[in-house]
């Protein structure tokens, strides 16, 4: 799924894995080729290191990447990623090896090594997941997606899952989703979603429904809501994209008002929350944003949070 980390309920993990198994096979081929080009490793060498990792985790129960590398010298070898690119860097072999084992469901990431904001995690052996037929898994995942993000277009679901166009259309059809007209074209909504709208009296009923008035939200970077659709114009001014996303398409912290993104926020090292509005939402919104900022600051208390993927605007608010 776009080689992005998703957190899902344990009972949904088998379907997620089966729905993306083709991509996992491609990831293994790509990782093996990358290690071969950078370090001269072949499939046999990769398998030996993977076996050593699994044996170490079985012995210890759980371990961080650094702990595994201290025990398995091969994991300390370094390779150049994206050679010749502006973002070229060096990384330990432990990163692609552990990532591949996790993608294949052979190990799982557990609790962080420190507080909940720590970027260092322990790894542990994973129990085998039950097999789900790929077509059934894709249908289940598409239904889950539409429940959370519908109505959505074919392009939205294809982008979110990383599936082919054929697989995306097939999964949508199997859900029984019904076509609805959206500003950006044809969208799809589950039958129960259409029934809910009809029960409220259609679009006019939605506008007047209890709790449907203007509301403010401060969402963290990479929150699944702004990353839920390929087409974003209905909740994000295209002119604001550059200020809110990094060059790889990762979104920073966002401020929402009345269902649209209107700015960003960041935590200063002293704990104070700064924000920047990209448009003037009016006095009511500014008052609500100040109140929500105070609430979020109180919630974070002494915790300091730094996004993994920084945007220039968010970074400027921390100085």
PLM feature spans:
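Long, low-complexity intrinsically disordered regions
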Residues: 1-226, 230-232, 237-319
């Amino acid at each position: 799924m776009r080689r992005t980390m998703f957190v899902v309920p344990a009972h949904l993990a088998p379907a997620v894995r089966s729905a993306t198994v083709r991509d996992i096979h491609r990831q293994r081929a790509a990782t093996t080729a990358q290690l071969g080009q950078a370090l001269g490793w072949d499939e046999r060498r990769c398998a030996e290191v993977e076996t050593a990792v699994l044996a170490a985790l079985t012995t210890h129960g759980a371990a961080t990447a650094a702990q595994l590398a201290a025990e398995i010298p091969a994991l300390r070898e370094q390779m150049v990623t994206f050679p010749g690119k502006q973002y070229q860097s060096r990384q330990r072999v432990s990163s692609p090896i552990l990532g591949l084992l996790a993608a294949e469901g052979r190990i799982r990431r557990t609790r962080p090594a420190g507080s909940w904001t720590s970027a260092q995690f322990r790894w542990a052996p994973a129990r085998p997941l039950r097999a789900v037929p790929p077509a059934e898994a894709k249908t289940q995942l598409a239904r889950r997606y539409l429940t959370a993000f519908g109505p959505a277009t074919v392009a939205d679901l294809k982008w979110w899952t990383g599936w082919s166009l054929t697989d995306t259309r097939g999964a949508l059809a199997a859900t029984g989703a019904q076509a609805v007209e959206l500003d950006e074209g044809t969208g799809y909504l589950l039958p129960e979603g259409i029934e809910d709208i009809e029960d409220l009296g259609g679009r006019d009923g939605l506008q007047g429904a209890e709790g449907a008035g203007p509301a403010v939200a401060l969402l963290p970077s990479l929150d699944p809501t702004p990353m839920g659709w390929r087409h974003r114009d209905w909740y994000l001014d295209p002119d604001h994209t550059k200020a809110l996303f990094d060059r790889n398409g990762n979104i920073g912290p966002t401020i929402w008002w009345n269902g649209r993104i209107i700015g960003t926020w960041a935590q200063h090292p002293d704990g104070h929350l700064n924000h920047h509005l990209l448009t003037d939402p009016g006095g009511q919104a500014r008052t609500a944003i100040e109140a929500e900022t105070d609430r979020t600051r109180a919630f974070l208390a002494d915790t300091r949070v730094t996004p993994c993927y920084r945007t220039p605007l968010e970074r400027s608010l921390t100085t």
